[in-house]
């Protein structure tokens, strides 16, 4: 897409042409300001939350760099963007805490612009709070119109006042906008947006909107471009990738998409997340088994092992169905790594319910698990439930669960000692000079001797020693 657009004319009506018009307009502003101050204008993007947010931030950075900003090192930069998360209350508090510092920085730098975007901004009470107490924030937008970032910025530049642009929902997907990847050798790729599951504790459907899938041809085209640019590993992203394709005019399944992506020449690894247990089909299991580029790792959120609690959570499966799915996975792919999410302290959770969760943990023997204390989110059904579990009881259960998960994870990790496995070198080890940090097919971390020029390549590494949740190893030969 060309940036040679006449910004004196009326902006185009269609996307993405309209956004390229506003990028050109914003670039004109940035170039003039840079000349005035005698240096490039800088940006700093802080990402809170999940892989979806991380990918959104790469899009924001792509737009910022296209309009002339250069990357700064911290929050003293000229343009600060907080891409926020609201899955747990603590995430909101982190943002509010940092805004206080930004206000002081802005007093010292009148050119500074502050933008807040992401899931937290989809909550009406948050936006009202910002309007009342954080008037120094320049731009506020949500999850549905990130593609309009340049246009919203231009509105702020022209008006000189706070611009708030929040969409309640959308079915729009805008392709072909700039993206600046964090890593040269791996990339996330959105295959869908939104969620239709409405788990009773979860705010995601309210802030990310209804489920909508990208066209497979657009996904394949994006991955082919990434591979041509040196990417060897991609992560297919969605709130529930297992339900991919249902909203398309010509529906296809996630298993079918995996098989198509697996055919792309030059691509070496395919990961995906997140999978909802209710949509785990036999066809998907077979696709994971048969596609040689698909990593043998499944993140399968349990949330609770109690069928009663799962019903209250609106998860659409019970303990027996979940265990059956794990059994089917391991029958077809014996060496698959299974990881999970577990919530402790959901309203009404009894000791018996908790012990059901512990039972699933002991039966499944997860490679690792993300364990969370239930966080009440305004607007969800669970927030109004009675029988909130006392904090001391929740903490006791959380500690017991964490101990069990860590014990099992450590035991499972020990089984790989002495084996030679392919490892993708990802970055220099920040704890040990002369070592690189890489990742196995099953997502485990390995540290081994290496240099910076090895990053982005896959090596066969002998796992000499397991140190809890990571390995020390040495290269045997190129993979």
Language model: regions and residue ranges:
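Terminal RNA-binding accessory module
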Residues: 1, 384-479
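Proteins enriched for Cys/Gly/acidic motifs involved in redox and nucleic-acid/cofactor modification
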Residues: 2-244, 283, 298, 320-327, ...
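Active-site proximal loops enriched in glycine and acidic residues that flank catalytic Cys/His/Asp
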Residues: 238, 274, 302-304, 340-344, ...
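Radical SAM enzyme [4Fe-4S]-AdoMet core and its adjacent flexible, acidic
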Residues: 50, 245-266, 313-316, 376-407
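Glycine-centered loop/turn positions within well-structured domains
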Residues: 147, 197, 242, 278, ...
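Conserved SAM/AdoMet-binding glycine-rich loop
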Residues: 113-116, 123-125, 228-351, 362
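Short flexible coil/turn linkers enriched for glycine and charged/polar residues
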Residues: 182-185, 195-197, 294, 304, ...
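Conserved, mostly hydrophobic/aromatic
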Residues: 199, 219, 236, 272, ...
């Amino acid at each position: 897409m060309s940036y040679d657009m006449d910004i004196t004319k009326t902006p185009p009506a269609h996307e993405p042409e309209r956004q390229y018009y506003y990028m050109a307009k914003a670039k004109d502003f940035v170039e003039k300001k840079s000349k005035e101050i005698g240096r490039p204008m800088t940006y700093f993007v802080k990402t809170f939350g999940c892989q979806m947010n991380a990918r959104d931030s790469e899009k924001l950075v792509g737009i910022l760099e296209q309009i002339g900003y250069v990357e700064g090192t911290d929050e003293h930069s000229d343009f600060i963007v907080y891409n926020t998360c609201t899955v747990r209350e603590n995430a909101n508090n982190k943002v509010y805490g940092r805004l206080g510092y930004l206000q002081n920085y802005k007093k010292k730098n009148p050119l500074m612009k502050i933008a807040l975007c992401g899931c937290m901004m989809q909550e009406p009470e948050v936006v009202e709070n910002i309007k009342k107490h954080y008037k120094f924030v320049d731009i506020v937008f949500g999850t549905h119109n990130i593609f309009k970032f340049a246009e919203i910025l231009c509105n702020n530049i022209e008006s000189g006042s706070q611009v708030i642009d929040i969409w309640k929902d959308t079915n729009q997907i805008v392709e072909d906008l700039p993206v600046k990847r964090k890593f040269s050798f791996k990339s996330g790729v959105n295959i869908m947006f939104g969620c239709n599951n409405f788990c009773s504790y979860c705010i995601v459907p309210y802030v990310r909107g209804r489920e909508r899938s990208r066209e497979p041809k657009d996904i394949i085209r994006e991955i082919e471009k990434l591979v041509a640019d040196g990417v060897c590993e991609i992560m297919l992203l969605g709130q529930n990738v297992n339900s991919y394709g249902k909203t398309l005019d010509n529906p296809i399944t996630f298993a079918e998409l995996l098989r198509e992506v697996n055919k792309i020449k030059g691509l070496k690894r395919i990961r995906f997340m997140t999978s909802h247990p209710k949509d785990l089909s036999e066809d998907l299991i077979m696709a994971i088994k048969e596609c040689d580029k698909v990593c043998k790792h499944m993140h399968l959120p349990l949330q609770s092992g109690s069928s009663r609690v799962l019903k209250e959570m609106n998860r659409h499966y019970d303990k027996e169905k979940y265990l059956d799915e794990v059994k089917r996975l391991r029958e077809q792919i014996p060496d698959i790594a299974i990881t999970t999410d577990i919530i402790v302290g959901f309203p009404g959770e009894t000791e018996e319910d908790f012990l059901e969760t512990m039972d699933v943990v002991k039966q499944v023997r997860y490679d690792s698990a993300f364990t969370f204390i239930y966080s009440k989110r305004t607007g969800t059904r669970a927030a109004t439930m009675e029988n909130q579990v006392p904090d001391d009881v929740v903490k006791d259960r959380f500690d017991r669960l964490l101990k069990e998960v860590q014990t099992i994870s450590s035991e499972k990790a020990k089984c790989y000692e002495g084996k030679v496995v392919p490892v993708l070198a990802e970055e220099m080890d920040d704890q040990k000079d002369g070592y690189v940090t890489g990742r196995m097919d099953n997502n485990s971390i390995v540290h081994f001797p290496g240099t910076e020029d090895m990053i982005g390549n896959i090596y066969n590494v002998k796992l000499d020693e397991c140190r809890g949740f990571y390995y020390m190893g040495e290269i045997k030969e190129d993979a």
